[in-house]
From Swiss-Prot:
This is Stress response regulator protein 1. Residues 19-39 have a biased composition (Low complexity). SUPFAM superfamilies: CheY-like. The keyword Ligase does not apply. Required for stress adaptation, morphogenesis and virulence. Gene3D superfamilies: 3.40.50.2300. It comes from Lodderomyces elongisporus (strain ATCC 11503 / CBS 2605 / JCM 1781 / NBRC 1676 / NRRL YB-4239). The lineage of its organism: Eukaryota, Fungi, Dikarya, Ascomycota, Saccharomycotina. Keywords: Phosphoprotein. It comes from the Eukaryota. The modification 4-aspartylphosphate is found at residue 260.
Length: 362
């Protein structure tokens, strides 16, 4: 028994052709009486401050049912960092920093950056810093045995079977020895240690009185700053006019006078001659600070009574300047004490002679 099926024929859809029909169809589609149509509104009725917190949230946990957010949730992909830290470390020669547990200052040290060719060595007293690599177990050992200068520093660099050892001391010589049987190379390089330490080891806390004379204000301030580093408790008088020096020296007792040579009206040589002409000022130290440092000038300064001459600019080590000034002041004070003691002894001897003469006459 055959069953006949009737083919379905769709009725053609009539499109509106006139504007009135278009308006009528639009009103029917937007009428609330049609339950089959679902209205979706993409507009959010709120101000900017109410929507701003929602924008800062994660789309996966947002309670809004925006169509754009749903599309982002469906199309979102997780980004994975494909970089391997092992490969990155191998690229940079597997250099890692390891401060030994025996280092008492390990807690106070930060992780330092080392170059694989020329490591930055940290010099500390009585402790060691070790740089190790996990692949070859190579170590960079830097040890200092004495903090005093000149010091002997040993740098030992080990990479597997080969060893490079460098020793620095105060002499200049080079020696190299190679052993092919053990594949070990030892190279000793000895160079002269340079001393460029311009720091002061210990300032002098004596309350000295200094007089500075210079017609250049900048040079005067530079010398004043240096002397304050050497003698923090010193009383320093600065004078630009050299004609006032005579009165200041007569009315005050200074331990040292620092004078410039080339000055108008009264130069440094005339000031030194005036000071040395007074016997009571023999304990006063006179030091010249000038650019004139030829042999003839130095001979003239010594003949005039200037104790020492510092050349400009003052590129001397602070310890050197302090030692020179202290030595001259002590020598001048010692000579004055000897003169006073000798004068007292001569007076006592004269009194004793007079007393003996009176006794003999009696």
């Amino acid at each position: 028994m055959t069953r006949l099926t009737r083919p379905m024929v769709r009725s053609p859809i009539s499109l509106p052709s006139t504007p009135s029909q278009l308006l009528h169809s639009a009103s029917l589609s937007s009428s609330p009486s049609s339950p089959s149509l679902v209205q979706q509104s993409h507009s959010y009725h709120g101000d900017y401050f109410s929507i701003k917190p929602k924008l800062s949230l994660d789309f996966a946990h947002s309670s809004d049912n925006f169509s754009d957010e749903s599309e982002l949730e469906n199309n979102s992909t997780s980004f994975v960092d494909d970089d391997d830290i092992v490969k990155v470390r191998e690229t940079f020669d597997n250099i890692s920093i390891d401060i030994g547990a025996s280092n008492p200052f390990a807690k106070n040290k930060h992780q330092w950056s080392y170059s694989p060719i020329t490591p930055y060595d940290i010099v500390d007293e009585n402790h060691t810093i070790t740089v190790s690599t996990p692949k070859t177990n190579s170590q960079l050992l830097y040890t200092t045995t004495s903090p005093q200068l000149p010091r002997k520093e040993t740098l030992s660099l080990k990479f597997g079977p080969s060893t490079l050892k460098s020793t620095v001391s105060t002499s200049t010589s080079t020696s190299t020895s190679t052993s092919t049987g053990t594949n070990t190379e030892t190279k000793t390089v000895t160079t002269a240690a340079k001393s460029t330490n311009f720091t002061l080891s210990m300032p002098n806390l004596q309350q000295h009185k200094f007089l500075l004379v210079d017609d250049n204000l900048i040079n005067l301030k530079i010398l004043n700053r240096i002397l304050l580093k050497l003698y923090p408790k010193a009383q320093i008088t600065q004078v630009l006019d050299s004609t006032k020096v005579a009165k200041l020296v007569e009315e005050n007792e200074y331990d040292a006078v620092f004078i410039d040579i080339e000055m108008p009206v009264v130069n440094g040589v005339q000031i030194a001659q005036f000071i040395r002409s007074d016997v009571s000022k023999d304990d006063l130290t006179v030091i010249a600070v000038t650019t004139r440092n030829s042999k003839e000038d130095l001979a003239l300064f010594e003949k005039t009574g200037i104790d020492y001459t510092f050349g400009k600019p003052l590129n001397y080590k602070l310890d050197f300047m302090a030692n020179v000034i202290d030595e001259i002041i002590e020598r001048r004070k010692g000579q004055m004490i000897k003169k006073s003691v000798s004068s007292v002894e001569s007076g006592v001897s004269l009194c004793s002679k007079e007393s003996t003469n009176t006794l003999l006459i009696a």
